[in-house]
Amino acid sequence: YYLLNKFDSTIIASNKILALEKADENVSEKASYYLAKSLLKNGNSGQAIEEFKKLTNAKNTEYASEAQYTLAEIQYNNIQLDEAEKIILEITSNPSSEFWLAKTFILWADIFKERGNKIQAKQTLQSIIDNYEGDQSIIDEAQNKLNEINNKQSQEQKLQEQKLQEQKEAVDEIIIENK
């Protein structure tokens, strides 16, 4: 159901599986995973957060890693940068998936940028571009975000140069008038 974007049906099916006493642990983790993702897609972030928290202890390290990343991302999206960074530090101290670790560093770069630390954001993104050897989409995402920061800095620099030029011209005009 989830892959068909039928999130309500996914929630119902996942809850039925989780209610079974004899459900296999792998099946239960998969049900919890899709339950959490569906709750989030449906805008029920409170319940989704609770499900993702449970998943951080999953034996399936991909589910656990994605759950931790998603918790950090939710905090970031809610402008809870300190909370997001706490989760990021937990992830980086005990990484279990290179993919989700790289995604975590990209999110961390977003936090640096949000806090005005563009140099650290750029260095973090460049490190991913230079060193990550996994999924190309991660490298592309890091490159796009780095380009975005560089383009914005370039625009800001051009505006600053334009203002300085206007000020210089105004001063020159005053000097010429006073001669």
Model segments located where?
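Acidic, polar-rich low-complexity tracts and alpha-helical solenoid repeat scaffolds
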Residues: 1-179
